[in-house]
Amino acid sequence: MYVDMPTTSLLDVSSTSFASREARMRREFVGAIGVTADLFTKFASEQELDLFLAWQVVAQHRRHLSEDLGTAVGLAVQPLYDSYPVRHSVQCSLLSMAMGLDAEFTDDELQAIGLGSLVHDAGMLLVPSRLLGVDPIKERDRRDLVRHPLYAAMALDGMAEAPPATRCVAAQIHERLDGSGYPHGLKDSAIHRLARYAAVADTFLGMISPRPHRPAHEPYRAVEEILFAAHRGRFDSSAVRTLLHVVSLYPVGSSVWLNDGRMGRVLRANRDAVDRPILIALDLEHDPPKLETVDLAKNPDLKVVRVGELFDEASKSGQNSSTPISTNDHFVG
C-alpha cells in the first residue's frame, strides 16, 4: 500500500537565499534526528509507534535522495559518535533507501525499507542499560538483547499505515543468510528481500562508527569485511553490490593515496566505477599545499594505490584501529 507522504513536515527548516543546498540538507538531517528522538522516547514510554513522526523522516529522506543523492549519501555514512541508537536509525533508513533507489525498488518497497530501518532499533530503549556496551555478553543477557528488533515489529502489527513489508524489515534486519543472525536465526529465503538490503546498510554503518567495546573502522575496511562475509554466504550478494554502487569501494570519508603521490579524502561514489570515486586531493609538494577535486573516472591515469587510517576520536585516544570487526556485531544497531 503506497502512502502519500506529506510534502511539508515538522522538519522544514527555513532557508535564506545565501544558504547552500548542502547546508540546508544538513540542517534538515539534524532535524530528522530530533524527530526520531521524539519517536523513540514516545515508544519507550508507551510501546506504540507514532507513524506520523516516522513518515516525516522517511518523506524527507526521499526528497533529499531525489534532490542530491551524493550529499544525502554523505550524510548517511558519517561516522556516529553520539546519539545512539537514534542517529544510527536515521542514517540506516537513509542509506537503505539510497540502496533501494539504486536497486529500482517500487515506491511501496522504498517506504517499507525506509520505515522499517528507521524504527527497528526503537526497542533498544527497552533493553536494560546494563547490557549495552558489554562485550562479551553473557548468554542469558544476550537473549534479552537480541529481542530488541521484535519490539518495534510487534508494534507495527495491524498498523494499516505501514506497507506490509515494513514489519519484516524491522524484525529481520539482524538476520543473516547463513543462519548466524538474530532474533530467530532465519536462513536464506526465510529472510525478506528488503531485510537483506537493510542488513547490509545497518552493518556497514555499525562498522564505521565506534561502539563501547571497540573503535570505529576505516570505511574501506568495512566494505572489505562485508564483501568477505558475502562470499561466505552471510549477506545477499545483490545487496552488497548495491552498497558498492552507492558508497563505492572507497566509501565517503575514506583516506586514500594516489599513484602520483597525492593523498585525498573521498567525497562521492561513481556508480559505474566503484573503484574510481570523486575525491579531494592534497598536493603537499605544492607551496602552499594545493587542494583539487578529482574525479578518478575522468582521469584514467590516476588510481588509488593505498588506503589510509580513519582520523577519528578512537585513533586520537591511541586505540588500535585493527580491532577485529564482526559483521554480526551485537551492537551494530
Language model region names:
Residues 6-33:
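Extended, charge-enriched "interface" segments that sit outside catalytic cores
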Residues 1-5, 253:
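N-terminal accessory interaction module
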Residues 4-7, 196:
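A composition-driven signal for long, intrinsically disordered, charge-rich low-complexity tracts
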Residues 30-333:
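Histidine- and acidic-residue-rich, metal-dependent catalytic cores
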Residues 1, 22-29, 304-307:
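Generic hydrophobic, helix-prone segments enriched in Leu/Val/Ile
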